[in-house]
Structures are given as C-alpha cells and as structure tokens.
From Swiss-Prot:
This is Superoxide-inducible protein 5. It comes from the Bacteria. Induction: By superoxide.
Length: 12
C-alpha cells in the first residue's frame, strides 16, 4: 500500500 508513496514519488 506504500508503493505510490515510496517509489511513486521517484517515478513522478
């Protein structure tokens, strides 16, 4: 559930 918070921040 934290994929968007951890890697998502770098992807965006």
């Amino acid at each position: 559930g934290n994929a968007l918070g951890k890697e998502g921040l770098k992807a965006i």
